[in-house]
A protein has these predicted regions:
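Membrane-embedded beta-barrel scaffold of Gram-negative outer-membrane proteins
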Residues: 560, 568-572, 599-657, 678, ...
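N-terminal periplasmic accessory domains that precede
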Residues: 117-122, 132, 166-169, 186-191, ...
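Short acidic/polar hinge/loop motifs at secondary-structure boundaries
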Residues: 87-89, 207-234
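Face-selective signature of the C-terminal outer-membrane beta-barrel domain
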Residues: 337-359, 378-538, 542-554, 558-563, ...
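Short, acidic, small-residue-rich periplasmic hinge/interaction motif at the N-terminus
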Residues: 57-59, 68-72, 100-104, 114-158
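Extracytoplasmic beta-strand/coil segments of soluble accessory domains associated
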Residues: 167-208
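Periplasmic-side early beta-strands and strand-to-turn transitions of outer-membrane beta-barrels
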Residues: 266, 285-369
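Gram-negative outer-membrane beta-barrel transporters
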Residues: 621, 625-630, 649-742
Length: 814
């Protein structure tokens, strides 16, 4: 490192230390201010002596729930409950009471309150507001789909009673392909328009999902806490703070204003049990809010494997037979408690949370089903604390502020302590190497404490123009040790990322034209202390601290020609910094690679969409999108030459182009038919090998990647079945098709001898019934209805036909 580099690094360190000190002082002042505000609020509440209560109704007589009844000039306010009733506690005196609700004229009434008093209000419809509401009253998912970004938006409410997890729900979405291994709790690979794995980032309420802890993914997040899912394709908005190459998935949790309890229990094939509980209690007068959630899942995962080769002693040859998995148990426990203040004048939400997760999994196979484990296990444990603050009109009008801080203690233990080689019968022979690592016995501990800070500021200049600034810090340590393997060298590495995004949004011509332009800055700092296996990991070249800095940018635009036709296009030069698993390995089966470079891609989308109203109760919705992805320094998992383990490397570039489309037909709220299809042309862009020789796989299709796939969904719904109010019967059927594809490079060997994964046809069906206005619900589901043999990553078999049932109780009247 040059003296100039040393000087710049020293200046950077001094600046960073000053920034940290300043940040700590600001935080101290902020905490003191928040405590004072809370104290003042408590004092106001403690001095309240009288109660003002009553009801809010429309002039036609119907009750109005969620109307805001507030005291002008104070922070006092309450929302009406489902019966339209409200309660306010206050000191005796004269007040101006304000009653407001979308679609109705605001009421202002001057009243005198000397003792407990009942005051009822009747609201008059506002024709102008109602007309505007018809235009703007679309669901958030629909408005998002009509933005400048290419995005799938999925409302979870119609699917809340389903036994499906998020993987299954997202996997049916347009342009998405999810491939799972080993049943419940198995690893999975999600592809968005061809780019998959770590090229896709996951968020929950705009916060990286990794903050939840090791082992937490789409498959084990309970659906009853989720409102909707946003899937961004290729171009990701700067407000997410994502270094995503192929896209991002943002899970939006429920933000209910009502109190509720939501509990469910499900049981199914292969010894599967799943229980979820979530709830919320908010005291309207003080704004104190408590939100607990708990989730438990267990599965034996002992489904049948078909056509497995085993050694037959009598015939002295390998024969094919069907056998059950026997070392594939999965158990997960997740719990979270969130508490704080909501809906006050000084904050929309100030919430503190603590969460815990534990995931224990037996390992049955390696990367392919020819490698069988019989004793190896993996356990992940995490504990997280966090704080979140949100306020509209923060300090000035039209400035919305979101601040989030969290710290997560994550640990993973991989146990690999037997010198055995197993087969599918459960038999084993003694060997001179462990099952996973192929070296000595080990119990590998990896601790990765993670700190995340996010600040998002959104300023609306007016209804047509807004600016958003987003800052995201993630700082992770890598503390690894092995008390069993005496040759393993412990170390403590560190990896930090700063991502700053700035975006400008226009909404012109009464919403017909929408533009978004953005720029992102990616800064990373890697500190390497480990020195073992330096000839594999490159640690000798990266010892000490190294930094990188990259710029990304993009824009998107949408123009609505008519209700039946809108056009949108978006582009991003995206940058993805290596993830901790890629840089630091996983402590057992994946080696570190400290020489990894950030990957980049130029992503382009051009799409059409629209709504066609066929008749009074018939509607047709369509969407089609053409996309191009040109990725450089593409990070890909490859087999390491030494000891046969894996390692991530910048080994290739990838060129992808394709087209996708979706068509939806709705008949009132009774029938919905949805069909989508995707075609990918994903090819290697690497022309030459490292030694300069031509690469035989140049312009070959990428191996082990589906390139044609489609989904069809049929949903029938009947409300007030047999004239009984508050009931709902729902039937769903979905069909998935995956075209055959090569398991290995198509440029290797003769066509007839190549391994292929055959075309697959998968059917699922479900039935749910709810009564008492959705309070009680029961669901039944059959997956892989026709019991077909289904494959996924590297031809690993998935479960055959299986059955599941689920009971759910939802209470929001208390």
């Amino acid at each position: 490192m040059s003296s100039d580099d040393d000087f710049r690094l020293a200046v950077s360190d001094v600046f960073f230390l000053k920034a940290v000190k300043s940040f700590r002082e600001d935080m101290k002042r902020t905490v003191v201010l928040i405590i004072l505000l809370c104290f003042i609020q408590w004092e106001v509440f403690a001095q309240s002596k009288v109660v003002l209560s009553g009801s809010v109704k429309a002039k036609k007589g119907s009750t109005i729930s969620q109307a805001l009844v507030s005291v002008e000039g104070t922070s006092l306010g309450a929302y009406t409950n489902k019966e339209g009733r409200y309660t306010l506690k206050m000191n005796p005196g004269k007040y101006t009471i304000v009653v407001s609700f979308m679609g109705y004229k605001t009421i202002k009434s001057r009243i005198k309150v000397q003792k407990n008093k009942v005051q009822n209000f009747k609201m008059e419809e506002d024709a102008i507001v109602l007309k505007s509401f018809e235009v703007e009253g679309k669901t958030k998912s629909r408005r998002l789909k009509e933005s400048a970004f290419t995005v799938n938006a999925i409302d979870i409410k119609p699917l809340i009673n389903s036994t499906n997890n998020l993987n299954a729900i997202i996997g049916r979405s347009n342009g998405i392909k999810i491939r799972e291994n080993g049943g419940v709790g198995g690893d999975f690979d999600l592809s968005i328009n061809g780019l998959s794995g770590n090229s896709v980032r996951y968020f929950i309420d705009g916060i990286p999902l990794s903050s939840m802890g090791s082992g937490i993914n789409l498959a084990n997040i309970p659906t009853n806490i989720i409102d909707r899912i946003e899937i961004y394709k290729g171009v990701v908005p700067a407000r997410l703070g994502a270094d995503a190459l192929g896209g991002a998935i943002n899970i939006i949790t429920k933000k209910n204003k009502r109190n509720y309890i939501d509990a469910s229990y499900g049981y199914g094939s292969f010894g599967t049990h799943k229980a979820d509980f979530s709830g919320q209690y908010t005291q309207e007068s003080t704004g104190i809010t408590i939100k607990p959630s708990v989730s438990y899942c267990f599965s034996k995962n002992n489904y049948e494997m078909r056509g497995i080769e085993v050694w037959d002693e009598e015939s002295r040859e390998f024969i094919k037979t069907n056998l059950d998995r026997y070392h594939n148990d999965y158990k997960s426990v997740l719990g979270q408690i969130e508490a704080g203040i909501t809906n006050k004048s000084w904050c929309d939400a100030l919430l503190f949370s603590a969460s815990y997760s534990n995931i224990d999994k037996e390992l049955q196979t390696g990367a392919t089903q020819s490698i069988v484990y019989g004793m190896a296990t993996r356990e992940s444990e995490s504990f997280k604390v966090s704080a979140r603050y949100k306020k509209k009109d923060f300090l000035i009008n039209n400035l919305t502020t979101n601040i989030y801080l969290s710290h997560t203690q994550k640990s993973t233990t991989i146990t690999d302590t037997v010198f055995r080689k197993y087969d599918w019968l459960g038999n084993y022979i003694n060997s001179g190497r462990s099952e996973i690592g192929g070296r000595g016995k080990s119990i590998r501990y990896t601790k990765r404490p993670l700190t995340i800070v996010r600040t998002n500021l959104n300023y609306s200049i007016n209804k047509q123009h807004s600016i958003n600034i987003n800052y995201m810090l993630t700082y992770l340590k890598n503390d690894r040790e092995d008390k069993y393997d005496k040759y393993f060298e412990s170390s403590e590495d560190a990896f930090g990322k700063h991502i700053i995004g700035l975006s400008y949004t226009q909404n012109l011509l009464n919403g017909k034209l929408n533009n978004n332009i953005f720029i992102k800055d990616y800064y990373s700092q890697l500190e390497v202390k480990q020195m073992d296996l330096y000839w594999i990991t490159g640690s000798d070249e990266k010892t000490g601290t190294t930094t990188t800095n990259n710029i990304g940018y993009g824009l998107g635009t949408k123009y609505k020609l008519a209700e039946e036709l809108s056009i949108k296009t978006s582009y991003e030069h995206s940058v993805r910094l290596p993830r901790s698993r890629e840089l630091l390995g996983n402590g057992a089966t994946v080696y570190p690679n400290f020489n990894l470079k950030p990957e980049s891609s130029d992503n382009l989308n051009i799409g059409l969409f629209g709504d066609i109203k066929i008749a009074e109760r018939h509607a047709l919705n369509y969407e089609t999108n053409f996309f191009v992805r040109k990725a450089k320094d593409y990070i890909r998992l490859v087999i390491a030459q030494t000891e046969g383990l894996s390692q991530y490397d910048n080994v290739s570039s990838v060129n992808i182009k394709g087209i996708e489309g979706e068509l939806t037909y709705d008949y009132d709220d009774f029938l919905q038919i949805k069909a989508n299809a995707s075609y990918l042309d994903e090819r290697s862009g690497t022309k030459y090998q490292e030694d300069g020789k031509p690469e035989i796989t140049y312009n070959n299709r990428m191996p082990n990647r589906p390139w044609i796939y489609s989904n069809i969904e049929l949903n029938l719904q009947k409300r007030n079945l047999f004239g009984k109010k508050g009931t709902q019967l729902r039937f769903g059927y979905d069909f998935q098709y995956v075209h055959w594809f090569y398991l290995t490079w198509e440029g290797f060997g003769a066509l007839k001898s190549k391994s292929t994964i055959p075309s697959q046809y998968i059917s699922n069906a479900n039935l749910s019934y709810g009564f008492s206005e959705g309070k009680y619900n029961i669901s039944l589901e059959c997956k892989n209805l026709f019991d077909r043999t289904v494959y996924d990553n590297y031809m690993l078999q998935k479960p055959g036909r299986s059955f599941f049932c689920k009971f759910r109780i939802f209470i929001n009247k208390f």
